[in-house]
Amino acid sequence: MSKIIAINAGSSSLKFQLFEMPSETVLTKGLVERIGLEDSIFTITVDGEKQKEITNIPDHAVAVNMLLKKLTENGIVKSLDEIGGIGHRVVHGGEKFADSVLITDEVLADIEELSDLAPLHNPANVVGIKAFQEVLPNVPAVAVFDTAFHQTMPESAFLYSLPYEYYEKFGIRKYGFHGTSHKYVTERAAELLGRPLESLSLLSCHLGNGASIAAVEGGKSIDTSMGFTPLAGVTMGTRSGNIDPALIPYIMEKTGQTVEEVVSVLNKKSGMLGLTGYSSDLRDIIAKEEEGDHRAKVALDVFVSRIHKYIGSYTARMKGVDAIIFTAGVGENSAIIRERVLEGLEYMGVYFDAKRNNVFGEEAFINFPHSPVKIIVIPTDEEVMIARDVLRLGNID
């Protein structure tokens, strides 16, 4: 049995989960927030109870030291020697990484080089990796990439209709994201269906504040809604999803904003927040719609219609689907959104059961037994996928 830590480092945060492997038992989990500020927050779960501490955590190295100290202080591990491996979520692996990989100096340099493709995320991921290297230099560490799962997409899916040299020189293409989540839920769907993954055509709907749809055929991603960046695809909490690119210079001309300012609006002030004017949270928006708010209704209609575009397109690409999967915050917990997405899809063999659909955050089939297309709610577990890859690649006993 080995203890493995799964790490997700943000620019001012560090999310962690400690597993006993291969049993996949969660020993503890927690979050360090507001790193670099005087009122940093350290939260850890010990024996089912959350412990919260507000203190000064100036950087990720201090956060890592504090985390490891808490593990020994609380008896979660007797000594740090029990930690057999560390798994780091890395947002962008470009074309270089089609699978998770053991971190070497060369790999770390490659991840840093890819930072121009994910300037908000990769630098923070690198900081997290280096912070653990300082404290646990001899423990195997593995990088698990959000983009890796989608590296099986064919050229017809990943190329943009731009001068081909842009792809050759600058790597401009669709990469796709949420890959670890899409991989987990499609593998789990095959288990629940009792069929080999290789025989299945699946639609994976990862619906959270960030959202993406993936077409997975034979266990391989053949297309996905996010693109060169996580800004593309369906309407999201604060992100616009796909728009006419000519809108960017038009908005600049009309508002006097710079390119960076317009892109910031598309990332942080658009989507459901932009359409409603008051919230990116679908729970708030659904409540407002029930009160008769027109913009809430329109925003929800837009959200669902954009998802339908991908369901229709990907069903055609795969010549039919065996199952539709709902995951992530909204997909797992919003029966209303699932119902609206599924309504009217009888033409493609989708028959959902409103009673069975009344589930929140748990695995469930929500289709009628006679439905040719199965509909499954599967809570995602990116952390366990990270831990599995550490076990697979780290030569851990």
From Swiss-Prot:
SUPFAM superfamilies assigned: Actin-like ATPase domain (SSF53067)
Family, per entry: Belongs to the acetokinase family.
Function comment: Catalyzes the formation of acetyl phosphate from acetate and ATP. Can also catalyze the reverse reaction.
EC category: transferase
Compartments (UniProt record): Cytoplasm
Family matches, as Pfam families: Acetate_kinase
Ligand binding (substrate): R89
Catalytic residues as annotated in Swiss-Prot or TrEMBL: D146
Positions annotated to bind Mg(2+): N8, E382
Residue ranges that the Swiss-Prot or TrEMBL entry lists as coiled coil: none
Catalytic activity: acetate + ATP = acetyl phosphate + ADP
Recorded GO MF terms: acetate kinase activity; ATP binding; magnesium ion binding
Key words, A-Z: ATP-binding, Cytoplasm, Kinase, Magnesium, Metal-binding, Nucleotide-binding, Transferase
Biological source species: Bacillus thuringiensis subsp. konkukian (strain 97-27)
Record note on quaternary structure: Homodimer.
Co-factor binding comment: Mg(2+). Can also accept Mn(2+).
Site (Transition state stabilizer): H178, R239
Keyword Magnesium carried by entry: yes
EC number: 2.7.2.1
Gene Ontology, cellular component aspect: cytoplasm
Needed co-factor(s): Mg(2+); Mn(2+)
The name this protein goes by in its record: Acetate kinase
First-listed, main subcellular location of the protein, grouped into a coarse class: cytoplasm
GO biological process: acetate metabolic process; acetyl-CoA biosynthetic process
Positions annotated to bind ATP: K15, H206, L207, G208, N209, G210, D281, L282, R283, G329, V330, G331, E332, N333
